[in-house]
Amino acid sequence: MPMRQLLLLRHAKSSWDDPALDDFDRPLAERGLKAAKLMGRELAARDWLPDQVLVSSALRTRDTWRLVAAELPAHPRVVFAEALYEASAADILSQIRKVDPSSGCLVVLGHNPGLEDLAKQLAGSGSEAKAHKRLEEKFPTAALARFVFDSEWSGLSVARLTHCLRPKDLG
């Protein structure tokens, strides 16, 4: 079975400027716009190119994906999933397990605390020590955790964390 890649990407920094806006409808802040583009360029440079993407349907996650996608050479299948908004780690994992079995590289673009909780839960033995330490320290906005594993999506429970990238480490 080929090696699969799972990329857990937290949405970029959002704006709290308009207190009247519902949380679901908050746009990206200026810093978030830059970070999303930076992470997109990093995915392209490392050749971590998704063939499928699950994106929370909140505005800040959709905007993050739009900016990331603009930096990629190809356009993967994208599913906007309301189930990823305010999702727990278990909710996110259940969405991942339903992914098309032919998919080799999946990006899940969502929110904390569920995304960070899932990343910590998935990181099994054989994970890179530096990446694990970063993940334990903080999983800020626009952070990316990359996992590899060689089972089916439907059976995912543990994987090898290879990288934990944060915009401040790249920019």
Residue ranges of each PLM-predicted region?
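Hydrophobic packing residues within well-ordered alpha-helices of enzyme cores
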Residues: T64-V68, I92, L118-A119
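Active-site-proximal alpha-helix that buttresses catalytic centers in soluble enzyme cores
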Residues: P2-A87, G124-E128, F139, G171
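Glycine-rich phosphate-binding loop signature in dinucleotide/nucleotide-binding domains
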Residues: R46-W48, K98-G104
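Residue-level preference for the first positions of well-ordered beta-strands
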Residues: L6, C105-V107, L144
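Domain-level recognition of soluble alpha/beta enzyme cores
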Residues: A123-R160
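Short, solvent-exposed aromatic-acidic interface loops
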Residues: R160-G171
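A glycine-rich beta-strand to alpha-helix segment
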Residues: G104-A123
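Short phosphate-binding loop-to-helix
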Residues: L84-P101
